[in-house]
Regions:
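Conserved catalytic or regulatory cores that recognize and/or transform ribose-phosphate-containing ligands
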Residues: 1-245
Length: 245
């Protein structure tokens, strides 16, 4: 009975009139190790997190760490890393990649082939590596991305992992670059049923309007809007939404 009511209500709506509110910023941050117990931050990413916690809370509160999703395979939410990366990129306002770990180089390789995402990617690279002789990273992916969207790559001298002191001016400048990058990203978008981030946010709205609601009823609501996706994809979206809060 409730499912029939849902169908009737959502059949009255036209998704071509939908706009997506993306003003709530989600900043996906991946890179080197983070260890709050370490006397010296083990990575540049860790230093940014420590710095923003004290000096730029307006950014810090929107950070989502890659480690948040380390159980994605245990939960059977995603079949592989590529599908997960597509979804997290779609729902994120900005993807910040510190090139300081094998995992971050994998991230770079994945996103380098998705030029439509360059506007929402910020790659933080080591000056020592970039300006090093015959730097493959600079001559290859970074140079390619910079030619497409120059604001997508920033370069800083890397902190010494064995020295506590580091010039906070670099961290402050990085925060400025993050804010400038965010300011260039619109706060609303035309809804697209091919955008997994838009689908996830639509599912949030359906749950909010119809709670308590079952998985099959969410699927019925989407079907009534002309969006035919499997319960597996709905489950993926719900997993992602739960993780980002």
């Amino acid at each position: 009975m409730f499912e029939e009511t849902i169908k009737k209500q959502f059949e009255l709506l036209d998704i071509s009139n939908f706009n997506v509110d993306i003003s709530h910023r989600l900043l996906f941050v991946c890179g080197g190790k983070v260890d709050v117990r370490a006397p010296i931050p083990p990575s540049f990413r860790d230093r940014l997190l420590t710095y923003t916690a004290k000096n730029a809370s307006e950014l810090h509160e929107h950070f989502i760490l890659a480690e948040t999703f380390k159980d994605y395979f245990k939960e059977n939410a995603y079949p592989d890393l590529l599908v997960f990366e597509d979804d997290i990129a779609s729902i994120s306002s900005l993807i910040i990649i510190f090139l300081e770990s094998p995992g971050s180089l994998v991230e770079l390789g994945i996103f380098c082939n998705k030029s439509e995402l360059f506007k929402k990617i910020l790659i933080v690279a080591s000056a020592e590596e970039v300006y090093g002789e015959d730097s493959f990273i600079y001559l290859g992916p970074l140079e390619y991305i910079k030619k497409k969207v120059s604001s997508s790559v920033v370069i800083y001298p890397w902190p010494d992992p064995e020295v506590l002191k580091y010039d906070n001016d670099f961290l402050d400048d990085l925060c400025v670059n993050i804010k400038e990058k965010l300011s260039s990203i619109p706060k609303t978008e035309q809804f697209s049923k091919d955008n997994s981030g838009h689908i996830a946010l639509l599912i949030t709205e359906i749950i909010s309007l119809c709670a308590p609601i079952q998985l099959s009823e969410i699927e019925s609501a989407l079907n009534s809007l002309g969006i035919n996706i499997s319960t597996k994809i709905i489950n993926r979206s719900i997993y992602l939404l739960q993780k980002v809060g």
